[in-house]
């Protein structure tokens, strides 16, 4: 009797609460499940020639409906039974179809019964969260809890695979002969396909390659032979939206169906359906799953996606940025596929039309409102231009767009724009010429040669022309009028003869080749223009807030250097300042480490296969070259870098030996800059290891302090810097002291006593004094002798007063210069020598102050050591002499010693009867007081600087002469003096805190100085004092904020750096915002400045106020000012500031809407 499949489905599948099956299963349990299963197996296997026994089927269905509760062995038996049934019935079915039978009732009924049993087993596993047929520690579907009472350790993969193989064999039959109507056939197929889709819901199942392959083959056969396309499309789309892990596997399934089973209908239908879906604003999961599916599908079958592009691009208008990102990646996959197809043919420089249109579409998305989409476009362009393609013009177009992205407001976009720009540089299409270098000078020189070659190949004019027509601009001439007369025929004939002669003399291929080469050079130069423009913008990102941008920028300039970009050296020098970036997080350390890595790559890693000597020469040469044309700031940063590397032991002993060889070479003259560079680097390395200088101490005495140093004062100055590094070890503590009689100390003294009129003498003097205080055992005694000797030299009678009148040689010299000229020369010489003496005295004074503080610290250290030793040796008596020495140290209290040092500093140095400095103090004050009466700027510079140093010694001296110092600062026309005094005032604020309020006012005034160098020095000084907590700021921050819009880029950059650091200190910008705003608004109105500057400053400052609580409070405080605004402009300023704050109450918005009222 034929089984009614529909009624069976309703009874056993659709009825979730089937009490009949539950009661039968209970009976089976009582009878023993294993025995019952064995009976069912025997019965069904023996009755394959007829329909299965109804009672036996009831037991099978009951057991299958509780499949999750069965033991592993029973499960295996059930699946083996189902596999055997399907295989045997499929064989019977095949024989009947081959025999053209018409009655398929028995195999049809038995297969339907087996399908129901199979579906019951899977439904039971699904309801119990045991869908995984592979043993794993986690056998649950994501998001569901595991039921600990169930059998979750079933490893039935082999048994299930056998069943799936049997289903594959079944689906290969001509089932349309058996189930003739589509509804019957679909109902039968669903018995097997629904469990297949259910098994795919398990992430563990789908990850198994062999299992997944069988599932996909079953679905593919159903689509290919049994009209399952529509049902498959529905199931795949539903699964996409419910199961996260199926997104990419579903794409694999569609790919297999399309390629292996020759059915594109399924893929096309799914794409059309997905492109028409609409998602809720809160739905994040749905768009993400669809996006993953489309991206995976486009990577597998890009040609199909190209055909469906009209449907796919609709998603570019979706509100979900996830879907827009997916379509961007889909377009990229299609482009890459098209490029690969073209690569199989001959590579062309022209872009295919399809690729051109797709890349244009991608370029448009660089204007997408979402930064994620803009970033995705840059990502895909990186993938595209990583391919071996040329497309020089398209590259230039993209490069120009990337330059715009470098200025994007999103750091993610900027960072990836740098990556793309680096990719465009490293894969540029001009590598066939000049070894791939993009050095402008090389290409310009090559272009000029090509143009000369092209001019030589051009036909020479044989017609005689009037001289006045030789210089006619050909752009002014129009084409010849087409009039057929004798003259025109004659001219044409002449031209034809000329061209025919030229064609005979020059091959046409040669002209074409040269013209193509010229075009190649022109395109290369255009590309170089774009790279240099991008490099200029990227250089601004070296100091960005986002650390990833900084690292990408550094890598870009390393690439630029390797490709010979002319401006790269400038930016690499700028990059070295990042060595100072500190941070408690890994980001700060990463930046410093990355700077070191970049510089190692650029300068300190010799070419491969270099010998030891060649490698040392390479490193030493590059170390010296880093000092060429370097500014003071660059040298300071280089010093920090080399100190770090030296402490890490990066430079070998041979490299240091090479540096000393360059410094001490005397067989022939060498470059001054090279010798200077060697000692500069040696001095820098000595910060990390003082042994570097000690290694060449004799060379320092012979070269830097000998004749070469006397001829080159800059060399002598850097030699003194290296010498003073001897006195400090890497930790900064005292290390080595030489007796005053040592050759080194005596050479330093002789250097200071040597007269000189060079401008470099002041710098040499300063460093020589510091070297004496660093290495001499008693530096104060040496400096006293130097000052006395210089004073005697200066004030002793001049030679011409003591010479006799009958000295013929002297008379001859007197005849050369008039008495007036000689007097002027003597006055100028005396003024310079006096300036040197005054400068030396001032620097000795400040170093003596440091020396006194060092003595005080050294006393305290020795006293502590003595006390510790006394305790340790209390049980071990020592001889009387040692005890007496300890008593001498410990007998004096620290307070007494400190008071003695303070008295010396305050009363002895500048006021003591026997003090040498006290003799010069009145002279310095007199020179500064009468600075208008003489025109010697060097003397005034030295005197004012020495005055500020003297003031640091004594509080009384400072109070007495502070008005004089401020007068010079306010009225002096020399910007160098004003610079020095700004720094001097900063030193006074550190030395004497009670002068801060009085001094700070004059410091802030220098921010409005007419000289930009003074403003820069003042801003740096104030920034240091504020960040160090030496000055408490109030309204003065508004004056500093105006520097954000200074015309000098150096000052505006400093201002940005200052406010960035200032904002990180206890919400400082928020706390002072109202004061800053008031100053800026008032100054903008008083000076009638453009409000654009005011708005840019306020926008920059509000970017530091991020906390919601602060923005609300600040909005309330600003809103309270609206009613107090006296002018429309003031009101507009407040409203603009409020517009920048995201949190505003309704009452504030109402005040704004009401507008300004007088």
From Swiss-Prot:
Alphabetical GO biological process terms: cell division; meiotic chromosome condensation; mitotic chromosome condensation
Keywords, alphabetical: Cell cycle, Cell division, Chromosome, Cytoplasm, DNA condensation, Mitosis, Nucleus
GO MF annotations, alphabetized: double-stranded DNA binding; histone binding
Region named Disordered: 800-826
Principal subcellular localization: nucleus
Localisation per UniProt entry: Nucleus; Cytoplasm; Chromosome
Family named by the database record: Belongs to the CND1 (condensin subunit 1) family.
Oligomer and partners: Component of the condensin complex, which contains the cut14/smc2 and cut3/smc2 heterodimer, and three non SMC subunits that probably regulate the complex: cnd1, cnd2 and cnd3.
Protein name as catalogued: Condensin complex subunit 1
Source organism per UniProt: Schizosaccharomyces pombe (strain 972 / ATCC 24843)
């Amino acid at each position: 009797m034929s089984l009614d499949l529909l009624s069976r489905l309703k009874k056993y599948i659709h009825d979730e609460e089937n009490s009949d099956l539950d009661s039968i299963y209970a009976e089976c349990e009582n009878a023993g499940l294993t025995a019952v299963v064995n009976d069912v197996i025997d019965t069904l296997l023996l009755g394959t020639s007829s329909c299965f026994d109804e009672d036996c089927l009831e037991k099978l269905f009951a057991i299958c409906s509780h499949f999750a509760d069965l033991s592993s062995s029973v499960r295996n038996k059930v699946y083996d039974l189902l596999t055997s049934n399907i295989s045997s019935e499929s064989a019977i079915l095949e024989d009947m179809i081959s025999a053209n039978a018409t009655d398929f009732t028995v195999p049809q009924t038995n297969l339907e019964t087996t399908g129901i049993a199979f579906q019951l087993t899977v439904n039971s596993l699904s309801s119990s969260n045991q869908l995984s047929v592979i043993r794993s520690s986690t056998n649950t579907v994501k998001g569901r809890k595991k039921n600990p009472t169930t059998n979750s350790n079933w490893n039935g993969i082999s048994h299930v695979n056998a069943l799936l193989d049997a289903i594959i064999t079944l689906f290969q039959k001509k089932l349309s002969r058996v189930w003739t109507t589509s509804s019957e056939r679909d109902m039968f197929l669903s018995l097997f396909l629904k469990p297949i889709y259910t098994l795919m819901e398990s992430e563990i199942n789908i990850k198994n390659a062999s299992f997944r392959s069988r599932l996909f083959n079953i679905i593919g056969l159903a689509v290919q032979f049994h009209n399952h396309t529509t049902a498959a499309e529905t199931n795949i789309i539903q699964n996409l939206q419910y199961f996260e892990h199926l997104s990419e596997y579903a794409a694999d399934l569609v790919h297999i169906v399309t390629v292996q089973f020759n059915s594109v209908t399924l893929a096309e239908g799914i794409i059309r359906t997905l492109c028409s879906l609409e998602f809720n604003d809160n739905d994040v999961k749905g768009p993400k799953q669809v996006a993953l599916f489309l991206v995976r599908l486009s990577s597998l079958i890009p040609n199909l996606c190209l055909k469906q592009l009209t449907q796919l691009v609709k998603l570019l208008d979706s509100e979900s940025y996830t879907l827009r990102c997916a379509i961007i990646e889909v377009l990229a996959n299609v482009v890459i596929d098209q490029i690969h197809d073209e690569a199989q043919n001959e590579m062309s420089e022209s872009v295919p039309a399809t690729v051109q249109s797709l890349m244009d579409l991608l370029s448009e998305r660089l204007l997408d409102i979402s930064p994620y989409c803009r970033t995705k476009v840059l990502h895909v362009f990186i993938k595209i231009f990583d391919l071996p393609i040329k497309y020089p013009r398209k590259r230039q177009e993209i490069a120009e767009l990337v330059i715009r992205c470098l200025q994007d407001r999103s750091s993610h976009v900027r960072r990836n724009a740098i990556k793309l720009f680096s990719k465009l540089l490293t894969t540029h299409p001009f590598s066939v010429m000049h070894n791939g270098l993009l050095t402008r000078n090389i290409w310009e020189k090559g272009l000029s040669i090509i143009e000369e070659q092209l001019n030589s190949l051009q036909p020479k004019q044989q017609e005689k022309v009037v001289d006045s027509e030789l210089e006619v601009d050909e752009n002014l001439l129009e084409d010849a009028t087409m009039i057929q007369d004798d003259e025109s025929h004659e001219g044409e004939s002449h031209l034809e003869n000329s061209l025919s002669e030229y064609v005979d003399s020059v091959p046409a291929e040669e002209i074409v080749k040269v013209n193509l080469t010229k075009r190649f050079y022109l395109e290369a130069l255009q590309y170089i223009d774009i790279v240099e423009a991008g490099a200029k913008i990227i250089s601004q990102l070296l100091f960005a807030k986002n650390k990833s941008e900084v690292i990408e920028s550094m890598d870009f300039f390393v690439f630029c250097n390797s490709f010979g970009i002319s401006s790269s050296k400038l930016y690499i020098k700028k990059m070295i300042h990042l060595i100072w970036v500190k941070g408690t997080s890994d980001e700060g350390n990463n930046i410093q480490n990355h700077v070191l890595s970049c510089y190692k790559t650029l300068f300190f890693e010799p070419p491969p296969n270099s010998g030891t000597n060649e490698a040392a020469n390479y490193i030493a040469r590059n170390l010296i070259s880093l000092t060429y044309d370097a500014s003071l700031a660059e040298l300071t940063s280089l010093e920090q870098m080399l100190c770090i590397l030296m402490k890490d032991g990066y430079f070998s002993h041979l490299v240091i030996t090479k540096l000393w060889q360059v410094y001490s070479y005397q067989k022939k003259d060498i470059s001054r800059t090279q010798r200077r560079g060697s000692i500069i680097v040696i001095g820098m390395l000595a910060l990390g290891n003082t042994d570097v200088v000690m290694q060449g101490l004799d060379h320092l005495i012979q070269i830097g302090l000998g004749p070469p140093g006397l001829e080159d004062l800059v060399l002598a100055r850097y030699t003194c810097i290296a010498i003073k590094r001897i006195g400090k070890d890497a930790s900064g503590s005292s290390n080595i002291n030489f007796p005053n009689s040592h050759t080194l100390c005596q050479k330093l003294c002789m250097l200071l006593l040597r007269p000189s009129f060079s401008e470099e003498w002041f710098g040499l003097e300063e460093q020589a004094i510091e070297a004496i205080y660093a290495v001499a055992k008693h530096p104060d005694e040496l400096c006293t002798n130097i000052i006395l000797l210089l004073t005697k030299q200066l004030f002793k009678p001049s030679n011409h007063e003591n010479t006799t009148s009958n000295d013929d040689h002297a008379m001859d010299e007197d005849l050369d210069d008039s008495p007036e000229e000689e007097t002027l020369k003597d006055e100028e010489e005396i003024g310079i020598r006096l300036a040197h003496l005054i400068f030396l005295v001032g620097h000795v004074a400040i170093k003596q102050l440091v020396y006194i503080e060092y003595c005080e610290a050294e006393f305290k250290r020795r006293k502590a050591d003595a006390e510790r030793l006394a305790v340790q040796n209390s049980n071990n008596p020592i001889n009387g002499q040692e005890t007496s020495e300890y008593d001498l140290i410990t007998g004096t209290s620290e307070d007494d010693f400190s008071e003695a040092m303070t008295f010396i500093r305050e009363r002895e140095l500048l006021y003591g009867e026997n003090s040498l400095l006290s003799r010069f103090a009145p002279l310095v004050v007199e020179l500064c007081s009468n600075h208008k009466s003489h025109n010697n700027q060097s003397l005034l510079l030295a005197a004012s600087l020495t005055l500020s140093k003297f003031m640091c010694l004594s509080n009384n001296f400072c109070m007495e002469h502070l008005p004089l110092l401020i007068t010079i600062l306010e009225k002096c026309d020399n910007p160098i003096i004003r610079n020095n005094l700004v720094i001097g005032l900063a030193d006074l604020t550190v030395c004497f805190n009670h002068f801060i309020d009085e001094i700070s006012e004059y410091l802030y005034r220098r921010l409005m100085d007419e000289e930009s160098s003074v403003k820069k020095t003042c801003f740096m000084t104030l920034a240091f004092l504020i960040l160090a907590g030496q000055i408490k700021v109030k309204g003065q921050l508004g004056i500093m904020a105006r520097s954000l819009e200074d015309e000098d880029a150096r000052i505006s950059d400093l201002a940005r750096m200052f406010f960035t650091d200032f904002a990180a200190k206890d919400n400082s910008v928020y706390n002072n915002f109202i004061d800053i705003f008031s100053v800026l608004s008032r100054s903008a109105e008083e000076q009638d400045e453009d409000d654009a500057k005011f708005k840019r400053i306020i926008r920059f400052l509000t970017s530091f106020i991020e906390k919601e609580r602060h923005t609300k409070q600040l909005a309330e405080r600003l809103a309270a000012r609206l009613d107090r605004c006296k002018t429309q402009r003031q009101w507009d300023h407040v409203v603009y500031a409020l517009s920048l704050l995201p949190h505003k109450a309704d009452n504030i918005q109402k005040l704004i809407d009401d507008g300004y009222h007088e």
